[in-house]
From Swiss-Prot:
InterPro entries: Chap_CCT_delta, Chaperone_TCP-1, Chaperonin_TCP-1_CS, Cpn60/GroEL/TCP-1, GroEL-like_apical_dom_sf, GROEL-like_equatorial_sf, TCP-1-like_intermed_sf, TCP-1_chaperonin. One of its GO terms (cellular component) is chaperonin-containing T-complex. This is T-complex protein 1 subunit delta. GO terms for molecular function: ATP binding; ATP hydrolysis activity; ATP-dependent protein folding chaperone; unfolded protein binding. It comes from Debaryomyces hansenii (strain ATCC 36239 / CBS 767 / BCRC 21394 / JCM 1990 / NBRC 0083 / IGC 2968).
């Protein structure tokens, strides 16, 4: 009886013995991730194409920045979402190489699929990939050229290489020095990192990209309030940043006040004047002469009567400061936000040599220059100009990438040749080391090495070159000791890209290979997909 029960029950355990399901899940995950990788492959390099994206709101984005494209793509498959996340991680870590990391991940997944078809266990593949990635980072450091932050020319060349694949590439002679100067100004010499939040990018429609400028200090897009005849320039400014309203108080509940005669009306107006005059006198008493007022969604941040009093007291007023600007302004000017008039004291004010409103390329901006307080972090503002919003948005993304490249060089002061040279060199080293290994690991190293060649292959394809001829030529050159041989778009073939000033930080390439191998490891270790209730 017992035997017959076991015999009957045994087919129900077939699910647990189904060996094909994990393989199908892995293939599905690899296919989805590679589809995303192939979608942005044409965007790589100086001859890469742009993508036009229409968002849910109907907004149009034109970009060839990998992180931006993937962020706005409607990616639904969870494994494909991992590729979006790895591109975002590269954007945070290095700022550049976001397209490369997605393409590398797709290529490594293709290599992993070949190994899985040979019957090699996924854990063994992922662990060997991890070791190969660690060795790749070592090879990249060995072939890199150490630089000093005093060598401004090298920094500018690296920033120019980053901009070469963007719409703004023809303006790189202006934007590259601008990116380098801004990072060096906000850099803390004690720490090997740069907080890019200290560099503020401001977009102004009007003019051309050539009119983009770097301002030492703070730039506000809000205009000075001139309706009451207040000043538009203040020297030796004492700046206050307030988060309360300069208008008569209103009750919390909705109610009506009924006025029966003119004496009551007169009394209300007198009290309103006295209330506002008292606040304005307190502001003047603290020696404040520039007032920044936070934007209010409930009621007017400042009314006409208060503006009249402030102009008579010779105080410059700038209203509608956005909530997300408060932290930057506090950091940049040394002023502390004031939420109540009773806390309005001189020690909460910031100081600057001059605050003035100027007209530039048909639009008005406010400059706060010469902030000299000891506890204030140095900040700079980059005013981007462009014919329309699409150009401005892409200019902002391009400058951000250039800033990140310079930040990478502050973290790791080493440059390598671009144009696929590092990937070919790493591939050559791993291929030669694979021959010394035994067993399955040899196959894995060889596949990893071949997968890295996707970068030079894609660069050649996007430049309209014969990828097989170019990559074969590069392999021969690297075998003969030419470590800096890469694809030169100018020469339409292989050449020494380091001598041609096609440079990139070593951190960009090492980070891309490490993150790509980690993403592949995560995908390979998934053998089932379960849906939660």
């Amino acid at each position: 009886m017992a035997q017959s029960q076991v015999g009957k029950g045994s087919p129900s355990n077939a699910t647990f013995r189904d060996k094909e399901k994990p393989q199908e899940v892995r293939k599905s995950n690899i296919l989805a991730a590679r589809a995303v990788s192939d979608a942005i492959r044409t965007s790589l390099g100086p001859k890469g194409m742009d993508k036009m994206i229409k968002t849910k709101n109907g907004e149009i984005i034109i970009s060839n920045d990998g992180a931006t494209i993937l962020k706005h793509m409607a990616v639904l498959h969870p494994a494909a979402r991992m590729l979006v996340d790895v591109s975002a991680a590269q954007d945070v870590e290095a700022g550049d190489g976001t397209t490369s990391v997605a393409i590398l991940t797709g290529s490594l997944l293709g290599a992993a699929e070949k190994l899985l078809n040979k019957g090699i266990h996924p854990t063994l593949i992922s662990e060997s990939f991890q070791r190969a990635a660690t060795r790749s980072a070592e090879v990249l450091l060995e072939m890199s050229h150490k630089i000093s932050l005093d060598d401004k020319e090298a920094l500018i060349r690296a920033a120019s290489t980053s901009l070469s694949s963007k719409i703004v590439s023809q303006h790189s002679s202006l934007l590259s020095p601008l990116a380098v100067n801004s990072v060096l100004k906000v850099m803390n010499e004690e720490h090997t990192n740069v907080d890019l939040n200290d560099i503020r990018l401001i977009k102004k429609v009007g003019g051309t990209i050539d009119e983009t400028e770097l301002v030492n200090g703070v730039v506000l897009t809000q205009n000075v309030v001139k309706t009451a005849g207040g000043p538009v320039r203040v020297d030796k400014a004492k700046i206050a940043l307030i988060q309360f309203q300069l208008s008569p108080p209103k009750p919390d509940m909705e109610n009506n006040v009924v006025v029966n005669d003119y004496r009551q009306m007169d009394k209300i107006l007198k009290e309103e004047r006295a209330y506002l005059l008292n606040i304005c006198k307190k502001i003047k008493k603290s020696k404040c002469n520039v007032l920044l007022i936070q934007k209010s969604i409930l009621r007017d941040a400042v009314n006409d009567l208060a503006l009249h009093f402030l102009s008579k007291l010779n105080i410059m007023v700038i209203k509608d400061i956005e909530r997300d600007e408060i932290e930057f302004l506090s950091k940049a000017t040394g002023c502390k936000p004031i939420a109540d008039i009773d806390n309005f004291t001189e020690d909460r004010l910031g100081s600057a040599d001059v605050v003035e409103e100027i007209e530039s390329s048909g639009s008005r901006i406010v400059k706060i220059d010469g902030v000299s307080a000891k506890n204030v972090k140095p900040t700079v503002s980059i005013v981007c100009r462009g014919a329309n919003q699409l150009v401005l948005d892409e200019t902002e993304r391009s400058i951000h990438d250039a800033l990140c490249v310079v930040r990478c060089l502050v973290k790791e002061k080493a440059l390598i040749a671009g144009g696929g040279a590092p990937e070919i060199e790493v591939s050559r080293v791993l291929m030669s080391e694979a021959n010394k290994l035994s067993g399955v690991e040899q196959f894995v190293y060889q596949e990893f090495a071949q997968a890295l060649e996707v970068i030079p292959t894609t660069l050649a394809e996007n430049a309209g070159l014969n990828s097989i001829n170019v990559v074969t030529d590069l392999r021969n050159r690297h075998a003969n000791g030419e470590k800096n041989a890469g694809i030169s778009v100018r020469r339409s073939g292989a050449s020494n890209t380091y001598d041609e000033h096609v440079l990139q930080p070593v951190l960009v390439s090492s980070s891309a290979i490490t993150l790509a191998s980690e993403c592949v490891k995560s995908i390979l270790r998934i053998d089932d997909i379960a849906f939660s209730r």
